[in-house]
């Protein structure tokens, strides 16, 4: 446990940790730095007056214990999450209610089912590629994140709702309302009391709720009308058909209960997939040998002409399952820059034991599996700070082979991320359709020249450190300024 003061609690230790870090670094990054002082991989920290005591866990065995205990999400996460989603969702539900809704959506997120929706994803990436072409023609530095966020919103709505928002080419009310809702939500990651308490948040969120739910209601009504005719393959249509077969299933009840689920798919999938795509571009630009291997793999699977990838995905989407090195790059990207973590509420009588046999009671604590610290824990990863996609392709007898349970980008077990297959599929499609046409290079040096300031600009050796941007997400700093050029 960090040094404790009766006057300031653990904030003295936090201040020492924060000193020398970028001012907008994520709380995850702050805790990563702090965790390096605790070799056991577990420690308590008291966040009074903003929160209670946290038990931070950064070992595979500790994370596995937490997973097996079936603990609930704490109010510090559940309340702001349900503010964004408009009610209980798969991320905040527990018990039998969670099981029912997870079972309804599992078929739509099954890998064999989703691969059939890959052409819809490819159609959205076509628009993204045209956006990149326009940027390449200008030859100017721009922030890539707004483009990737719009791509992920369009993709998620296409797959889950069979609805084309065209948000990549024009603002859509649903996406705009979601963005505002996320920006106004507070997950307790800011220590500024004015931002936390003195806001017009309730009024803004009420308005956003109305906009989002109105759109979702219209789309569910459309899906219901089309059930007797055109059979949509969207995730929501599949869930609706199964729901209406239940003895107490009604359309109005489904609409009321499903809106938070769709909003959580948008919220959770939008930021995380966008950030992972950005970091994949970033890391591949820094590691040209890995980029060359990815491009070679795409040549071998899709043929030598990048213009044909979209058509080939439409003809045989299962080609996307033949990209082991591309998948390794994405898993290594998620290891170095995981977009989220997992927090659960401790209970009396529930204890976690570290690798040395030390017991940590969880009563009165929020138990935080700090994914970024686990992924950078040198006790469980060879060359933990290095980008080595090959670690995902070696045998179990190789020194680089990942330790069991040490990679938790999507968590494990029954409550693992339901959207992980969709996210990985979208990322593979995006890389396959962009990397052989474009060179995408971070341009932080030029950005810092245009927008100079005296703040610290690096963390852990990266200018593209994970930055806070509302809603508790981890985004590449400054929206990933870059230059895009056509490959010769």
UniProtKB/Swiss-Prot annotation:
One Pfam family from the record: p450
Cofactor(s) it depends on: heme
Role noted for this protein: Cytochrome P450 monooxygenase; part of the gene cluster that mediates the biosynthesis of sterigmatocystin (ST), a polyketide-derived furanocoumarin which is part of the most toxic and carcinogenic compounds among the known mycotoxins. The first step in the biosynthesis of sterigmatocystin is the production of hexanoate by the fatty acid synthase (FAS) units stcJ and stcK. The polyketide backbone is assembled by the non-reducing polyketide synthase stcA by condensation of the starter hexanoyl-CoA and 7 malonyl-CoA extender units followed by cyclization and release of norsolorinic acid.
Known pathway: Mycotoxin biosynthesis; sterigmatocystin biosynthesis
GO molecular function list: heme binding; iron ion binding; monooxygenase activity; oxidoreductase activity, acting on paired donors, with incorporation or reduction of molecular oxygen; versicolorin reductase activity
Superkingdom of source: Eukaryota
Alphabetized Gene3D superfamilies for the sequence: Cytochrome P450
UniProt keyword list: Heme, Iron, Metal-binding, Monooxygenase, Oxidoreductase
GO process terms (BP): positive regulation of sterigmatocystin biosynthetic process; sterigmatocystin biosynthetic process
InterPro entries to which the protein is assigned, alphabetical: Cyt_P450 (IPR001128), Cyt_P450_E_grp-I (IPR002401), Cyt_P450_sf (IPR036396), Cytochrome_P450_monoxygenase (IPR050121)
Protein name in the entry: Cytochrome P450 monooxygenase stcS
The EC number(s) this enzyme carries: 1.14.-.-
Gene responsible for this protein: stcS
Top-level EC class: oxidoreductase
Traits of the deletion mutant: Impairs the production of sterigmatocystin and leads to the accumulation of versicolorin A.
Induction: The genes forming the sterigmatocystin biosynthesis cluster are co-regulated and induced on oatmeal porridge or the fungal isolates were grown either on oatmeal porridge or in YEC medium (0.2% yeast extract, 5.0% corn steep liquor). Expression is positively regulated by the cluster-specific transcription factor aflR that binds the palindromic sequence 5'-TCG(N5)CGA-3'found in the promoter.
Entry binding sites for heme: 417
Alphabetized CDD domains for the sequence: CYP59-like (cd11051)
Family note: Belongs to the cytochrome P450 family.
């Amino acid at each position: 446990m960090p040094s404790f003061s009766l006057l300031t609690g653990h904030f003295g230790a936090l201040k020492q940790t924060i000193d020398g870090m970028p001012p907008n670094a994520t709380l995850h990054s702050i805790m990563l730095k702090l965790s390096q002082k605790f070799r056991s991989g577990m420690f308590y920290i008291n966040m009074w007056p903003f929160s209670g005591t946290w038990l931070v866990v950064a070992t595979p065995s500790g994370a596995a214990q937490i997973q097996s205990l079936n603990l609930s999400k704490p109010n510090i996460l559940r309340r702001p999450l349900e503010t964004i989603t408009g009610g209980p969702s798969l991320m905040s539900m527990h018990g039998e209610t969670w099981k029912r809704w997870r079972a309804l959506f599992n078929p739509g997120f099954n890998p064999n089912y989703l691969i059939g929706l890959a052409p819809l994803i490819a159609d959205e990436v076509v628009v993204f590629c045209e956006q990149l072409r326009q940027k390449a023609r200008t030859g100017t530095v721009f922030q890539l994140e707004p483009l990737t966020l719009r791509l992920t919103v369009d993709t998620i709505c296409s797959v889950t709702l069979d609805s084309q928002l065209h948000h990549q080419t024009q603002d859509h009310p649903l996406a705009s309302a979601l963005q505002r809702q996320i920006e106004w939500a507070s997950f307790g990651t800011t220590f500024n009391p004015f931002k936390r308490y003195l806001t017009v948040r309730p009024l803004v969120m009420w308005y956003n709720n109305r906009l989002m739910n109105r759109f979702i209601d219209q789309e569910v009504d459309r899906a219901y009308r089309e059930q007797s005719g055109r059979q949509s393959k969207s995730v929501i249509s599949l869930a609706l058909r199964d729901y209406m077969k239940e003895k107490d299933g009604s359309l109005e009840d489904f609409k009321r209960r499903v809106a938070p689920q769709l909003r959580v798919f948008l919220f959770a999938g939008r930021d995380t997939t966008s950030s992972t795509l950005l970091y994949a571009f970033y890391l591949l630009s820094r590691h040209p040998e890995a980029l060359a291997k990815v491009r070679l793999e795409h040549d071998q699977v899709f043929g030598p002409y990048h213009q044909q990838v979209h058509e080939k995905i439409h003809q045989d989407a299962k080609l996307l399952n033949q990209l082991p090195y591309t998948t390794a790059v994405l898993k290594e990207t998620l290891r170095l820059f995981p977009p989220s973590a997992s927090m659960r509420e401790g209970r009396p009588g529930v204890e976690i034991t570290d690798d040395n046999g030390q017991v940590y009671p969880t009563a009165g604590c929020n138990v935080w599996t700090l994914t970024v610290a686990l992924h950078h824990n040198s006790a469980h990863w060879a060359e933990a700070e290095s980008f080595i996609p090959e670690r995902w392709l070696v045998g179990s007898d190789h020194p680089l082979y990942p330790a069991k349970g040490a990679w938790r980008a999507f968590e494990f077990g029954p409550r693992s991320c339901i959207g992980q297959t969709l996210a990985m599929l979208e990322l593979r499609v995006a890389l396959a359709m962009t990397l052989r046409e474009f060179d995408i290079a971070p341009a932080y040096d030029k950005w810092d020249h245009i927008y100079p300031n005296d703040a610290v600009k690096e963390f852990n050796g990266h200018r593209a450190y994970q930055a806070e941007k509302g809603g508790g997400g981890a985004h590449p700093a400054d929206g990933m300024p870059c230059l895009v050029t056509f490959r010769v």
